[in-house]
């Protein structure tokens, strides 16, 4: 290597280092200091370090490049998503096996029984809304990766055990399969159902409630209004960190039409509320399928049941924890509803729950309800839809 070439190489390398260093400082440009951040308490340095790590340009570059290689070469995303056909994405919770699944299912079924008994003691009827997995409803869009054997018959097993435990659980799978001819019941890039899918489920539940005559009182009319349709980036795209360098590789966004539901006589009810404390006859408990207003499941349920519904669903905590919190709430203890709709995605049955925030003795009492002597081995019963 000649002297000139060595100098050129050294200067080029030095220029590259300076350029990369200058580029990397861009991560600090958007940092904003608050009054609580000082050099003395160390909060300023810690906050700057955290912000810089999150906004580090080279880190974003590496993340984007690595994700693009996984996506294009191996048709894979980050843990959390499974890639299907025709830009369909699925939650890996509907695919992966679970260690100790049999024991977890037995424990969760025991809790479901205990919930049913607690509600009955307060004069409330449980309606268990088992939501079929998106991967079960849209098997035609599955790719090379298939759900573990644990999930093969999970929906039917869940329903069989509910019947054996005398838990009222209307079927939602058949109505959803039939509704696919009219439109999507699950979002292509998201874990959740569409507003149409939520409406189909609500109508099926309402028909079952009506057949059993579970609601008393005068019906209340509701109306649902459709809003604008806009592109919607589903939650499963968060496991494909291709943005911003390779955003063109991302699946196209879904189209989501906003729906809102209101009482037909909303103004009259508002006036009546000044003079009367009206007890709401139905409670809804569940997951983000119920809590997120994007899907309008609450509104669809109100319109289908022709009844006001109080929503106690929570986002990000699964179906069991919100129900246990509801059973301990003053709202339930002081004014138990006639019907409690418990939205429960099937994939949560074999999942472990962190119940450390609840009294262990109370949890044990729920698990050892009056039906605890029944054998609920999931392998004992098989049914069809």
UniProtKB/Swiss-Prot annotation:
Might you give the EC number(s) for this enzyme? 2.3.1.-
Q: Name one GO molecular function term.
A: acyltransferase activity
GO cellular component terms attached to this protein's record = periplasmic space; plasma membrane
Which CDD domains does its entry note?
AlgJ_like
Sorted alphabetically, which keywords does the UniProt record give? Acyltransferase, Alginate biosynthesis, Cell inner membrane, Cell membrane, Membrane, Periplasm, Signal, Transferase
Q: Which family does it belong to?
A: Belongs to the AlgJ family.
Q: What does this protein do?
A: Together with AlgI and AlgF, forms an inner membrane complex which probably interacts with the alginate polymerization-transport complex and adds acetyl groups at the O-2 and O-3 positions of mannuronate residues. Acetylation of alginate is important for the architecture of biofilms and increases the ability of alginate to act as a defense barrier.
Know the name of this protein?
Answer: Probable alginate O-acetylase AlgJ
- Which species is listed as the source? Pseudomonas putida (strain ATCC 47054 / DSM 6125 / CFBP 8728 / NCIMB 11950 / KT2440)
